[in-house]
Amino acid sequence: MNNIWWQTKGQGNVHLVLLHGWGLNAEVWRCIDEELSSHFTLHLVDLPGFGRSRGFGALSLADMAEVVLRQAPDKAIWLGWSLGGLVASQIALTHPERVLALVTVASSPCFSARDEWPGIKPDVLAGFQQQLSDDFQRTVERFLALQTMGTETARQDARALKKTVLALPMPEVDVLNGGLEILKTVDLRQPLQNVPMPFLRLYGYLDGLVPRKVVPMLDKLWPHSESYIFAKAAHAPFISHPDEFCHLLVALKQRV
């Protein structure tokens, strides 16, 4: 049974697990890990098949969540960015006793556009899947460029993401494909109505992958949750607005 790459930093009395997004790895958190590890016991994770967590093929969302849980602390705040938000949400649904609070960042319970639901057009996701087999490095780079588009610091934010990707070997194509399949098919809108723990949802106003129109829709669907929109951020608010981002998490810690 393979273990995933897992790094623990800091001595805080509350555990915080950070789960990265599609195509990336835990190096994406280096812009905030020093600050967060001064407040939390921080856990940095490479999701199965990504970064240093080699030896995994494409997994379903449920299987990915179970693999991550095997090495996790008994109880933690779980924070997931983008695809990682679905993994953290799945853990909150299946093992609520392990989750002090759930935080999703630039994430949607249903990334794919549906009837009366804004999201990524299914043919765009299918196009990414098709292009992966042709030129997967270029496809990943295009996806990263989408994530920072529109922000004042778009160029340097995109460079930071690209550096994260290139710092480690690229994931296998089937792992990348499996991640896109999760983004294309999973819909947790209804299940997440009933999660019992504090639930904080963070968004970028300029996000091209998770449209801000979903925010009031989810405020209504999940009245027990809280939402916050970074006015000048896109898909990676922790890179463009690290201080504001960390401040929100430290404030959440006081409430759990």
Curated annotation (Swiss-Prot):
Q: Where in the cell is it found?
A: Cytoplasm
- Where in the sequence is the signal peptide annotated? none
* UniProt keyword annotations, A-Z: Biotin biosynthesis, Cytoplasm, Hydrolase, Serine esterase
Q: Give GO terms: molecular function aspect only.
A: pimelyl-[acyl-carrier protein] methyl ester esterase activity
* Lineage, uppermost ranks: Bacteria, Pseudomonadati, Pseudomonadota, Gammaproteobacteria, Enterobacterales
| Self-association and partners | Monomer.
Name of protein: Pimeloyl-[acyl-carrier protein] methyl ester esterase
Entry EC number(s): 3.1.1.85
Its annotated pathway?
A: Cofactor biosynthesis; biotin biosynthesis
